[in-house]
């Protein structure tokens, strides 16, 4: 069993909201309109297999600890239960009804959003915002975003899953613009902690450094698609930790199958 300990403060807050209405053209721009990678390296060297294994375990332990430290007190709103997009509640606001109509146009005949459809949606939106520096959302990034939001493991996003993701993207896009103080279109390493804290993630220095190595360029600058991809993954990991920490002890135990499910489908 893996024992994951938590001993530092976490973040608060979950999905954002607002700005859902309008026709397809207006909504695509309005939903995302702002309010106003390199990978890590591995250790090497001689000393035998036992030493290498020890190094790997220390690295893995550090990753687990850094994540659990930040997740312990994170209190996001979980995505609502999955329902068909046409199941309109009597007290539903006109804004949400408009979003249902938008979803019906975006999702296609199966009324679910695939990774390819999500990629097309996001890339259409970011082209309307030249102040957001991005290389565009790639298919692999969107597959990962779908996977970590896919609560029922269908491989696609239903209405509530998509709405939760979309609300978060809108909130995080506003934060991105707010903390891009030099208007470079990117967030640099010194701007990153403030942006992440505004999004509800209070991380330690070790985890910030890991994120910069994974999601930023060689100069330490993070563009918009990497910023969103990183926050989607953090949000999902924190929600997973909270759901497994049923007693609120700041510790979870998972077997190897649960661990693989958490880490491989993401």
UniProtKB/Swiss-Prot annotation:
<feature type="domain" description="EF-hand 1; atypical">
    <location>
        <begin position="94"/>
        <end position="128"/>
    </location>
</feature>
<feature type="binding site">
    <location>
        <position position="110"/>
    </location>
    <ligand>
        <name>Ca(2+) 1</name>
    </ligand>
</feature>
<dbReference type="GO" id="GO:0110158">
    <property type="term" value="C:calpain complex"/>
</dbReference>
<dbReference type="InterPro" id="IPR011992">
    <property type="entry name" value="EF-hand-dom_pair"/>
</dbReference>
<feature type="binding site">
    <location>
        <position position="112"/>
    </location>
    <ligand>
        <name>Ca(2+) 1</name>
    </ligand>
</feature>
<dbReference type="GO" id="GO:0004198">
    <property type="term" value="F:calcium-dependent cysteine-type endopeptidase activity"/>
</dbReference>
<dbReference type="InterPro" id="IPR002048">
    <property type="entry name" value="EF_hand_dom"/>
</dbReference>
<feature type="modified residue" description="Phosphoserine">
    <location>
        <position position="6"/>
    </location>
</feature>
<feature type="binding site">
    <location>
        <position position="152"/>
    </location>
    <ligand>
        <name>Ca(2+) 2</name>
    </ligand>
</feature>
<keyword id="KW-0472">Membrane</keyword>
<feature type="modified residue" description="N-acetylmethionine">
    <location>
        <position position="1"/>
    </location>
</feature>
<feature type="binding site">
    <location>
        <position position="107"/>
    </location>
    <ligand>
        <name>Ca(2+) 1</name>
    </ligand>
</feature>
<feature type="binding site">
    <location>
        <position position="186"/>
    </location>
    <ligand>
        <name>Ca(2+) 3</name>
    </ligand>
</feature>
<keyword id="KW-0007">Acetylation</keyword>
<feature type="domain" description="EF-hand 4">
    <location>
        <begin position="203"/>
        <end position="231"/>
    </location>
</feature>
<feature type="binding site">
    <location>
        <position position="156"/>
    </location>
    <ligand>
        <name>Ca(2+) 2</name>
    </ligand>
</feature>
<keyword id="KW-0963">Cytoplasm</keyword>
<keyword id="KW-0677">Repeat</keyword>
<keyword id="KW-0106">Calcium</keyword>
<dbReference type="GO" id="GO:0005509">
    <property type="term" value="F:calcium ion binding"/>
</dbReference>
<feature type="binding site">
    <location>
        <position position="154"/>
    </location>
    <ligand>
        <name>Ca(2+) 2</name>
    </ligand>
</feature>
<feature type="binding site">
    <location>
        <position position="223"/>
    </location>
    <ligand>
        <name>Ca(2+) 4</name>
    </ligand>
</feature>
<feature type="domain" description="EF-hand 3">
    <location>
        <begin position="167"/>
        <end position="202"/>
    </location>
</feature>
<feature type="binding site">
    <location>
        <position position="150"/>
    </location>
    <ligand>
        <name>Ca(2+) 2</name>
    </ligand>
</feature>
<keyword id="KW-0479">Metal-binding</keyword>
<keyword id="KW-1003">Cell membrane</keyword>
<dbReference type="GO" id="GO:0005886">
    <property type="term" value="C:plasma membrane"/>
</dbReference>
<feature type="domain" description="EF-hand 2">
    <location>
        <begin position="137"/>
        <end position="170"/>
    </location>
</feature>
<dbReference type="InterPro" id="IPR018247">
    <property type="entry name" value="EF_Hand_1_Ca_BS"/>
</dbReference>
<comment type="subunit">
    <text>Homodimer or heterodimer of a large (catalytic) and a small (regulatory) subunit. In presence of calcium, the heterodimer dissociates.</text>
</comment>
<keyword id="KW-0597">Phosphoprotein</keyword>
<feature type="binding site">
    <location>
        <position position="184"/>
    </location>
    <ligand>
        <name>Ca(2+) 3</name>
    </ligand>
</feature>
<feature type="modified residue" description="N6-acetyllysine">
    <location>
        <position position="177"/>
    </location>
</feature>
<feature type="binding site">
    <location>
        <position position="135"/>
    </location>
    <ligand>
        <name>Ca(2+) 4</name>
    </ligand>
</feature>
<dbReference type="GO" id="GO:0005829">
    <property type="term" value="C:cytosol"/>
</dbReference>
<feature type="binding site">
    <location>
        <position position="191"/>
    </location>
    <ligand>
        <name>Ca(2+) 3</name>
    </ligand>
</feature>
<feature type="binding site">
    <location>
        <position position="161"/>
    </location>
    <ligand>
        <name>Ca(2+) 2</name>
    </ligand>
</feature>
<feature type="binding site">
    <location>
        <position position="182"/>
    </location>
    <ligand>
        <name>Ca(2+) 3</name>
    </ligand>
</feature>
<protein>
    <recommendedName>
        <fullName>Calpain small subunit 1</fullName>
    </recommendedName>
</protein>
<feature type="binding site">
    <location>
        <position position="180"/>
    </location>
    <ligand>
        <name>Ca(2+) 3</name>
    </ligand>
</feature>
<feature type="binding site">
    <location>
        <position position="117"/>
    </location>
    <ligand>
        <name>Ca(2+) 1</name>
    </ligand>
</feature>
<feature type="domain" description="EF-hand 5">
    <location>
        <begin position="232"/>
        <end position="266"/>
    </location>
</feature>
């Amino acid at each position: 069993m893996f024992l994951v300990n938590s001993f530092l403060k976490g973040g608060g807050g979950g999905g954002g909201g607002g700005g859902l209405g309008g026709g397809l053209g207006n909504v695509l721009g309005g939903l995302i309109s702002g309010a106003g990678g390199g990978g890590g390296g591995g250790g090497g060297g001689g000393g035998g297999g036992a030493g290498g294994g020890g190094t790997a375990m220390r690295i893995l332990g550090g990753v687990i600890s850094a994540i659990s430290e930040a997740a312990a007190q994170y209190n996001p709103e979980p995505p609502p239960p999955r329902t068909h997009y046409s199941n309109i509640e009597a007290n539903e606001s006109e804004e949400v009804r408009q979003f249902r109509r938008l979803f019906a146009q975006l999702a296609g005949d199966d009324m679910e959003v695939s990774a390819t459809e999500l990629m097309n949606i996001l890339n259409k939106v970011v082209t309307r915002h030249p102040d957001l520096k991005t290389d565009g959302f790639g298919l692999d990034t969107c597959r990962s975003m779908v996977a970590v939001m896919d609560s029922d493991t269908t491989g696609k996003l239903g209405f509530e899953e998509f709405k939760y993701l979309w609300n978060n993207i809108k909130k995080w896009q506003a934060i991105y613009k707010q903390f891009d103080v030099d208007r470079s279109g990117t967030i640099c390493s010194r701007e990153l902690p403030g942006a992440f804290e505004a999004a509800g993630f209070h991380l330690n220095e070790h985890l910030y450094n890991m994120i910069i190595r994974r999601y930023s360029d060689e100069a330490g600058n993070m563009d918009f698609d990497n910023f969103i991809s990183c926050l989607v993954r953090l949000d999902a990991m924190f929600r997973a930790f909270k759901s497994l920490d049923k007693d609120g002890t700041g510790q979870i135990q998972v077997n190897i199958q649960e661990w693989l499910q958490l880490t491989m489908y993401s």
